[in-house]
């Protein structure tokens, strides 16, 4: 069972949650002064239209025609499936649906914001976009977006993933991007971390620092971010806006689930539904899933912190483990991040979104069952949502409830097979920090 929307039903506007949040978003702080960040400084880092969108209180923002045309070319609208074989295997009365972002040409949801960011950069005359990537999904998406828009792309990829997932960098190079393992010897911050540990596995926080340092050296370059900030999450709401239309062919969901690193794929599916709950039109339950190795939602502190490891970004008020936290080299590279989207942090604080955390071995076990029943190999990140959906379906079985579960399968794992090989060979290790910098006041 699946629902596929015609191109004519593709969303024409993104949904911006800022005017509907239960409290105002705290302003970003200048890392040099700890005062609210002036927009002029943000304009040196980001494309100007993205800075405008980041601050906008407009509830809906038009998707440019060029971006919508490219959305159609890369696979939007994406299909929504019912996981009937998984339901049978679990012997649950629950009905499980998933939005499949792996159907895009790059294999994940990341292309949704990559095309938008590259479009606005090209319109401004920017010549190069520089970014970070964890597992490589975001780097792949921006590399293609740059190729389609005629903009050069440079990617700093977390070193652990650079070697765990070698074919990701092959695809990025095929699309014309430059790619470097992070930490690298190309930046001052990269050399600092390499001097401390020549085999440093890196992480999103370090890669972000390197990308921003790189951008600040080149007036014709700007930074593109794959998650966390509001404009990125807003671009992803095409997922949830499509899903709302598709679920009309089936039934209304009771619970909505997504994995979380910075928060973009969760927000993409959930935020259009969150609006209905905030408006009092529905009583949806929202579950955000993270790895126990990077538990920013379940164990982090809500405070101002840097978005990167080197302290170059504005400080944001968010759930954080502390920007100095060393995230272990789990295979879900896209979830190896110390912080969290500020908008999602607020929703968690108000009890609208409930976070849960899992070890990677139990996540891969859930992914194996999903692959055997539904035929799709989930990305390790997306497999966290699979695990939560399975647990929820088993709970419904215990309680005899015919619950309707919707989750975001944000990408496929066909280029993440080293993690699956390690899982099948019994080589996966679970990580859970005993101490966290944020709990010691180190932010």
Curated annotation (Swiss-Prot):
Keyword Iron-sulfur: no
GO cellular component: cytoplasm
Listed pathway(s): Amino-acid biosynthesis; L-tryptophan biosynthesis; L-tryptophan from chorismate: step 5/5
Main EC class the enzyme belongs to: lyase
Record keywords: Amino-acid biosynthesis, Aromatic amino acid biosynthesis, Lyase, Pyridoxal phosphate, Tryptophan biosynthesis
GO molecular function, one term: pyridoxal phosphate binding
Residues bearing the modification N6-(pyridoxal phosphate)lysine: 110
Matches recorded under Pfam families: PALP
Catalytic activity: (1S,2R)-1-C-(indol-3-yl)glycerol 3-phosphate + L-serine = D-glyceraldehyde 3-phosphate + L-tryptophan + H2O
InterPro entries (UniProt xref): Trp_synth_b-like (IPR006316), Trp_synth_b_CS (IPR006653), Trp_synth_beta (IPR006654), Trp_synth_beta/beta-like (IPR023026), TrpB-like_PALP (IPR001926), TrpB-like_PALP_sf (IPR036052)
Entry cofactors: pyridoxal 5'-phosphate
Enzyme Commission number(s) of this protein: 4.2.1.20
GTP-binding found in the keyword field: no
Quaternary assembly: Tetramer of two alpha and two beta chains.
Stated role: The beta subunit is responsible for the synthesis of L-tryptophan from indole and L-serine.
Family per similarity comment: Belongs to the TrpB family.
Protein's name in the database: Tryptophan synthase beta chain
Species of origin: Thermococcus onnurineus (strain NA1)
